[in-house]
């Protein structure tokens, strides 16, 4: 059959979504950008060696944000405290920063926000990520979405990735929920597939415990539709407010 080239963006595509699209005949290219960067800032340029990988491993490569888009002057993952590049080890987290003529000049009539955004001469995206050995960037989370639990940083995207691999999960989003003992713990909001029957919160939590370090598994699961923007992006700020209304873990 014919292969259809598709660009995806708005939010990082879970590997399960990429696998499903590839199986349907779509060749996926992942684009990343912000309003402030006037569209794509990075793209996950496919590499010839990926063709030899299994579909799951290939999807893991394709889900990364990738390399600098040709119209962008420069990108880097920097330590925001020292403004020095993080090592390309796939583990050390820094903030993705951009600069170039396609990046905005500033926020209208808001010089304080502009100065903060361009501290150190780079535009601070607010996205935390790593650089892999091949130079490809992978975003781990928005800085405001990182869950601080018992002194450990938990990436909400990593937990969501595990949830999307569950065969009965159609959509998922994870936010922090206050916890008397740990400070914060992951709270998962999940939309099940139409054919899902008798899937409980305990089933979802156990799935995560089987696929993640135990401390990263959600302690609470809320089922139902997820709030979205007109373009289909999940509105996590609404979910954070909903999580605040839930009884606090103790």
Predicted regions and their residues:
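Hydrophobic/anchoring residues in structured secondary elements
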Residues: 8, 174, 220-223, 239
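Conserved Rossmann-like nucleotide-binding pocket used by diverse enzymes
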Residues: 7, 124, 155, 222, ...
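Acidic/polar alpha-helix N-cap and adjacent early helical turns
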Residues: 242-250
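Residue-level recognition of the N-termini of beta-strands and the immediately preceding loop/turn
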Residues: 1-5, 218-220
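AMP-binding/adenylate-forming catalytic core of the ANL superfamily
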Residues: 100, 105-106, 128-215, 227, ...
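Conserved AMP-binding/adenylate-forming
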Residues: 4-9, 13-31, 35-136, 143-146, ...
């Amino acid at each position: 059959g014919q292969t259809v080239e598709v660009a995806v963006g708005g939010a990082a595509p879970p590997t399960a979504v990429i696998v499903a699209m590839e199986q349907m005949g779509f060749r996926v290219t992942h684009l990343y950008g912000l309003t402030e960067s006037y569209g794509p800032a990075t793209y996950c340029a496919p590499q010839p060696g990926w063709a030899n990988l299994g579909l799951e491993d290939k999807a893991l490569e394709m889900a990364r944000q990738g390399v600098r888009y040709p119209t962008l002057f420069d990108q880097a993952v920097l330590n925001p405290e020292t403004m020095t590049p993080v090592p390309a080890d796939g583990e050390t987290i820094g903030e993705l920063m951009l600069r170039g003529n396609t990046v905005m000049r500033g926020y209208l009539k808001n010089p304080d926000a502009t100065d903060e955004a361009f501290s150190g001469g780079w535009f601070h995206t607010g996205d935390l990520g790593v650089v892999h050995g091949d130079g490809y960037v992978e975003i781990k989370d928005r800085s405001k979405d990182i869950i601080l639990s018992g002194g450990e940083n938990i990436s909400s995207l990593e937990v969501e990735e595990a949830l999307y691999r569950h065969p009965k999960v159609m959509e998922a989003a994870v936010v922090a929920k206050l916890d008397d003992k740990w400070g914060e713990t992951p709270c998962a909001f999940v939309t099940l597939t139409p054919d899902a029957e008798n899937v409980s919160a305990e089933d979802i939590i156990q799935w995560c415990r089987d696929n993640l370090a135990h401390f990263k598994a959600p302690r609470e699961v809320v089922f139902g539709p997820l709030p979205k923007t007109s373009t289909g992006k999940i509105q996590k700020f609404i979910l954070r407010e909903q999580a605040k209304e839930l009884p606090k873990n103790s």
